Amino acid sequence: MKSRKNILISLICMIGISFVLLSGCSNQKEPIVKSDHYQTKTPLTMVGFVDEASKKELKIHNEKEERFTYLLNKTKINNCDHLTKGDHVKIRYVENKIKNKKGKAIEIWLINPTEIVDQAQAILNGMSLEEKVGQMFFVRTPIGSGASDAAKYQLGGYILFDRDVRPYDKVGLSNQLQTYQNNSKIKMLIGIDEEGGTVNRLSRYLAYRGAPFLSPQALFAQGGMDLILSDVKEKAELLNSLGINVNLAPVSDVSINPNDFINARAFGKDADQTADYIGKVVNAMNENHIGSVLKHFPGYGNNVDTHTGIAYDKRPYDNFLANDFKPFEAGFNARAQAVLVAHNIVDCMDPNFPASLSKNVHDILRNTLHFRGVIMTDDLDMEAIKDFIGTSSPAVFAIKAGNDLVMCSDYANQIPSVLAAIQNNEISEQQINESVHRILTWKLNINIIQGGN
């Protein structure tokens, strides 16, 4: 009798243990595997590096060394004919739903081919710290010392304003810009704001074009997207002929209210229509070999002009997710490689710092929107920043926040401040290397420099 009782107790214990084990397994989350094992439960959006690519499947790993397999039976590959090991890619399921992804098509965007990444690293390895920091400054062209300052500071680039183009004709300006390039070990970004409409640094002068370029809204009203894309091509041809390789455009802000400060410069449609416009314009700029800069992240909305003071944005974060971020995401997906961050203070993201100086805002760009290109400040000489920074170094603030490129005039003082911050361990040299690698990658992608520099 006692033996039967013991057997019964043993059976009950075994059943109980089995139940606990089975219950635990059913509720246990699948662990993240950091090995050669590839998970088939794939995230909705992924940025990573190709390990293997075939017609049937794609194996990739992300920056955390997590590995995933994507089935390619329904795949749309944008901007690349094939993928090879080491390519930097972004993958997204077409339908924005996490569950029931079986059979859903995915889209793949090539961020950077592995050979571009390797070429940028090779150039970076041969640079001094001073040269690296110089590359992080995209500055107003100095009057009278453009060539000598290019040689002295090895600047990342010059931005042209009215005063820089007005004295010349096409041949004269082209020759002047070439003198800057001749004094740079690493060829410079030469940028200009040629948005069309109210902002035309170049075409406002008859020496460069018979009439100023029209605004996106005016072009769309006259001829739809076909006329806009024709305009993009003409701008690119003009800028390239002069030696200008970056147009600080397109304006990616969502504005449907004519009274908004930014409205006349924006597309003037809702978020989805603006996103469609931005994607097509960036694609056209890439096809015509001109660098694009999406601006002004995270979106001006109905804010005031930060050229004259700090703007405070009280809109909820959901508003940005549903509207303002969409055009920027469309631009990133079309392989825009630079984004300009505005000076407005966006309360829901960071109530204490302007967006351009906010680590929170830059984290959103990197971790929420998965942007891997160049982040640059708006002009640090604007009143919005002067009001906030006081006598401190705006460049140090900007780089600590996560900016790769600093836009300013006072580079002769700002560059030594950044070098001092590195020596004092305020800024790590690893961060500098990562930023300069992105800048070099951008220059390689738009053919400013080649692998051998």
Identify the role of each PLM range.
Residues E66-D81:
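Beta-strand/loop nucleic-acid-binding surfaces
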Residues K2, C13-E63, N79-I116:
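Short, flexible, surface-exposed loop segments at domain boundaries
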Residues Y277-V293, N323-A336:
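Phosphate/pyrophosphate-binding betaalpha-module
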